[in-house]
Amino acid sequence: MKSLTCFKAYDIRGKLGEELNEDIAWRIGRAYGEFLKPKTIVLGGDVRLTSEALKLALAKGLQDAGVDVLDIGMSGTEEIYFATFHLGVDGGIEVTASHNPMDYNGMKLVREGARPISGDTGLRDVQRLAEANDFPPVDETKRGRYQQINLRDAYVDHLFGYINVKNLTPLKLVINSGNGAAGPVVDAIEARFKALGAPVELIKVHNTPDGNFPNGIPNPLLPECRDDTRNAVIKHGADMGIAFDGDFDRCFLFDEKGQFIEGYYIVGLLAEAFLEKNPGAKIIHDPRLSWNTVDVVTAAGGTPVMSKTGHAFIKERMRKEDAIYGGEMSAHHYFRDFAYCDSGMIPWLLVAELVCLKGKTLGEMVRDRMAAFPASGEINSKLAQPVEAINRVEQHFSREALAVDRTDGISMTFADWRFNLRSSNTEPVVRLNVESRGDVKLMEKKTKALLKLLSE
């Protein structure tokens, strides 16, 4: 029995050909069907050149297991989340490799209610069955049906439920879909704005879906992927810039000067907006950078709740706490009314409405927060011995630390600064985040000291 290396901690991702191909996709479909025994599931795929073929092989595996398949076509991951909870079906699978290189593809799996299927919640079971490849013969009388459906209008209806279009004043927005799956959704949102008479002008960059990614793999978390959005904001004198990754489950924002705004400060902005409408609500955040979020949420009368990093952990904690909103500094934003799932479309609509309601630019809204809690942003270091390096840092700072937290990696808090250090699940990399209380130089000094310690 050959092991399938495309099964990762939270999803499926692999190099095309050997790690992931149509035969393996069929086996994954068959295994999902045998393990969960769903009646109906939804399928979708991103713009990658292999997504359609892998999706159809997956569908055949599911049908062979007796599962009815509803195919929503080219879509972002959150459209599968939406379809799963909106239709009340038993699960969903999106074929996507998000921002991975061209020669990769993958899958994100959910069960009923758009709950994630990850390592300890069924993914290992699906892997075991797919690897064994020992399925009962196909019963043609019980073979599942296949149907193509279109839910785009219902999805856009849902998105517009988060804002009041009457609050929108004249806005010019640059939106960079990166030739990914976001383009058609942006078109549908633009058409809806026009139909409702909203004074919003969208300047669309790289809006045509193209699995060849002629303008590079869309991953605005990387500074080298931000120039086209920044330049368009400056050229057109736009109020804000928005950029997506390939399956648009993350959304990245740029202010009116084309400056990239770290996702950390957007979490505070959205938390405050939700608490204005829902006083006393719980807000979930990750441990990497937290002081700004805790400060904003507490001041607004909400309850901040820290969760381990990663979508499966955040979603589980949101359900447990019945939190209205959750945010990670990595530009993942989660919403209770979106079945506790993450969306890349809801955040920019909310921020656009906030710009109009507050009568302030995005830059003005986050400037004070950025000054109050300056942050390093996540710095990755490739190390031969990551565990030893983390232990070295902990020993060095243990005497002066006021608090130590191990929710995710290690967080150490001092009077005027704090840091979080965690190792990657998938590679020999440690990820460092540092923040201070209103002191950029202190933050920079401590960041340098930590990086030096790590590399010794």
Curated annotation (Swiss-Prot):
EC number: 5.4.2.8
Protein name: Phosphomannomutase
CDD domains noted in UniProt: PMM_PGM
Active site residues according to the UniProt entry: S98
Reactions catalysed, as given in the entry: alpha-D-mannose 1-phosphate = D-mannose 6-phosphate
Metabolic or biological pathway: Nucleotide-sugar biosynthesis; GDP-alpha-D-mannose biosynthesis; alpha-D-mannose 1-phosphate from D-fructose 6-phosphate: step 2/2; Bacterial outer membrane biogenesis; LPS O-antigen biosynthesis
Cofactor field: Mg(2+)
Function summary: Involved in GDP-mannose biosynthesis which serves as the activated sugar nucleotide precursor for mannose residues in cell surface polysaccharides. This enzyme participates in synthesis of the LPS O antigen.
Pfam families for this protein: PGM_PMM_I (PF02878), PGM_PMM_II (PF02879), PGM_PMM_III (PF02880), PGM_PMM_IV (PF00408)
GO molecular function, one term: phosphomannomutase activity
